A protein has these predicted regions:
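Thiol-/selenol-based redox modules, centered on thioredoxin-like
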Residues: 120-182, 474, 480
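Gly/Pro-rich loop segments of beta-rich domains
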Residues: 156-176, 202-234, 269-296, 324-350, ...
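Conserved redox-active cysteine motifs that mediate thiol-disulfide chemistry
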Residues: 38-55, 508-509
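Short, internal strand/loop/helix patches
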Residues: 84-119
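Extracellular/lumen-exposed scaffold segments
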Residues: 404, 471-599
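Structural microenvironment flanking redox-active thiols in thiol-disulfide oxidoreductases
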Residues: 47-89, 100-104
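N-terminal "domain-start" segment that seeds a small globular fold
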Residues: 1-26
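Conserved beta-strand positions in repeat-built beta-propeller and related beta-rich domains
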Residues: 181, 186-192, 245-256, 264, ...
Length: 599
């Protein structure tokens, strides 16, 4: 009995990027191994996959064509100019289909960001993988296809549809965060150029404003005077007495390298101070800062005697002690959602901005569009309603809405300023009154807010500059938006949840460190689940849906540890996937939900 082959669906969207203006279709891609990468530029897991794909693009050259299918979550991501900026910002060096209506997403039955689909040179789907961490599996599939279709004569290894746009000439390119230095200068992470820039003034358009550069500007990892970074973001100034002891003044969140770097301002020397360079996959128990794996550190702040790290890649805050040389989790469980409480129990979703104010630490949680506060060992949400609710609404904090904020700062009057990135605004929260207002709007993806020289300075990332905007407090009601996707009908009461997983060929489950399976279940709203929430070690679980809740989103995080079965020195692998499954609770709905974790 032969297995039927599935013809790949056509690529349909609003337009194309990185093709020199040409529209692509599968007929033009015939003869190539094609990998469709369904992504959205807000999603940290999608950004991880972009970096997993880079070595495959280099290895297989023109025999392989990666096609990014951009299927957006937030309203801002539907803007074609915002997508074009993101493609440049993150160094996407392959064609990208703009799929704002999720047409191609639906045609391939994608259910999660990111999803990868492999198409053979004859136009048939051969593999689908959801989530990140599939580089080795992709390498094996692509290698087999290249070998087999070379033998068949159906592989075209020459020519590429990718056409690079010429680089723009600006003093900064997609700056991320800024830091006021003693003496009045500003230090800025020039993220898309993989370097730090020291500015003598706020407007860097004039060459005279650039007082110095740290880093060669090449994407990479190198210490010393000729340092290299990889899309650096956050900056934190150490207290003078700490800096003297450790030999560096500033801690840098070197995001894509999964490192923290130390910078000595006197001569620009860079040192790696935390991280191995490998992306965090599971807790190894290590405490020495240079022995622990990090995951996309996005911001850093000095608070309570240490550097707090917004570990966006695993939805946690970490604590780095530069004197002791230790690092580890400080808040969060790695579950991506919104839950308050003691620091060890809270849930976050891509924390991306930090600001200390005495005994309080403020943070913005990008994927829940939330402003949150840490105080007295607990975290509470001030603004934000969950993973799928966002907008631009001022008023009482409980009713206010933001859209994917990336930066936060404390104003001289004690209020909190938020870089409300996808709304293009600076928002103000007054802890005394509990009110949220808009200070400035019409900005191009503001990513940080600081106070320097008595002025509020905004990193206007997509405009490639720093600005000190005129701040005119106003109330805005831009509406409430909710992410909508295809929904699954489930029956009330007990529901059987099953995660299907089979180790890849040549691998087996790895029991070396306990159970190789971990499954965490939560819901938005939390009231959707009467029982069955939390972490467990089984792939099958009975959960119970609460009476009186019409629906919501079931959030499932599953991971499986495997190792090579026969190798003398077996490599270890961790497969992880997050699902957000929108459900409606109806009488005739399904009583079982099955999700596939692909290795």
């Amino acid at each position: 009995m032969t297995q039927s082959r599935v013809r790949a669906a056509e690529l349909v969207g609003r337009g194309w990027l990185n093709t020199g203006g040409r529209r692509l279709d599968l007929e033009r891609l015939r003869g190539k191994v094609v990998v469709l990468d369904f992504w959205t530029f807000c999603c940290i897991n999608c950004l991880h996959v972009l970096d997993e794909l880079r070595p495959l693009e280099e290895r297989y050259g023109d025999a392989l064509v990666i096609v990014g299918v951009h299927s957006p979550k937030f309203d801002h991501e539907r803007d074609p100019d915002a997508l074009a900026a993101a493609v440049e910002r993150y160094g996407v060096d392959h064609p990208v289909l703009d799929d704002p209506d999720l047409t191609t997403w639906d045609a391939y039955a994608a259910r999660a960001w990111p999803t990868l689909v492999v198409i053979d040179p004859e136009g048939y789907v051969v593999s689908t993988m959801a989530g990140e961490g599939h580089r080795e599996a992709l390498d094996a599939v692509i290698g087999d296809l290249v070998r087999d279709h070379t033998a068949k004569g159906t592989l075209d290894p020459e020519g590429t549809p990718y056409v690079a746009d010429p680089p723009a000439e600006t003093a900064l390119r997609f700056p991320g965060k800024a830091l006021a230095l003693p003496g009045g200068d500003l230090l800025v992470t020039d993220s898309a150029r993989h370097r730090l820039v020291r500015l003598a003034g706020i407007e860097p358009a004039a060459a005279s404003a650039v007082a110095g550069v740290i880093g060669t500007g090449e994407r990479g990892r190198a210490d010393g005077a000729e340092a290299q970074f990889n899309e650096p973001q956050g900056l934190a100034l150490l207290p003078a007495e700490v800096a003297e002891r450790v030999g560096y003044d500033v801690v840098v969140a070197d995001t894509v390298n999964h490192l923290l770097r130390g910078v000595r301002l006197a001569d620009g020397t860079v040192t790696t101070v935390a991280g191995t360079g490998a992306q965090w996959r599971s807790d190894t128990g290590a405490e020495a800062a240079l022995d622990v794996d990090l995951s996309s550190p996005w911001d850093v702040a000095w608070f309570d005697g240490a550097v707090i790290v917004a570990m966006a890649g695993i939805h946690q805050l970490w604590r780095f002690d530069p004197v002791a040389g230790t690092a580890g989790p400080w808040a969060g469980t790695t579950v991506e959602s919104l839950k308050d409480g003691p620091l060890a129990e809270v849930w976050m979703a891509q924390p991306s901005g930090l600001a200390a104010d005495g005994d309080r630490l403020w943070l913005v949680d990008a994927e829940t569009s939330a402003l949150r506060c840490v105080e007295d060992g607990r975290m509470r949400t001030v603004v934000g309603q969950g993973l799928f609710d966002f907008g631009h609404v001022d008023g009482p904090a409980a009713d206010a809405l933001m859209q994917h904020p990336l930066g936060v700062g404390v104003l001289p009057d004690g209020a909190v300023a938020v870089a409300d990135t996808y709304n293009g605004a600076v928002r103000r929260y007054d802890p005394a009154t509990g009110a949220v207002t808009t200070l400035a709007s019409g900005l191009a993806e503001p990513s940080d807010v600081i106070v320097a020289g008595g002025r509020v300075v905004v990193v206007e990332s997509a405009a490639h500059r720093l600005v000190a905007p005129d701040l005119a407090e106003a109330a805005v009601d831009g509406g409430h938006h909710r992410v909508t996707r295809k929904r699954t009908a489930v029956a009330p009461g007990r529901l059987s949840l099953e995660v299907l997983f089979t180790p890849a060929a040549g691998q087996k489950l790895d029991h070396s460190f306990g159970s190789p399976i971990a499954v965490t279940v939560s819901a938005d709203p939390p009231q959707l689940l009467a029982s069955g929430a939390g972490r467990g070690e089984a792939l099958v679980r009975e959960i119970e849906l609460a009476d009186g809740v019409a629906g919501g989103v079931l959030q499932v995080v599953a991971q499986a540890a495997t190792c090579d079965a026969e190798a003398e020195h077996p490599a270890c692998h961790l497969t992880r996937q997050d699902w957000g499954v929108p459900v409606d609770v109806v009488a005739d709905g399904a009583r079982a939900l099955r999700l596939v974790l692909r290795s």
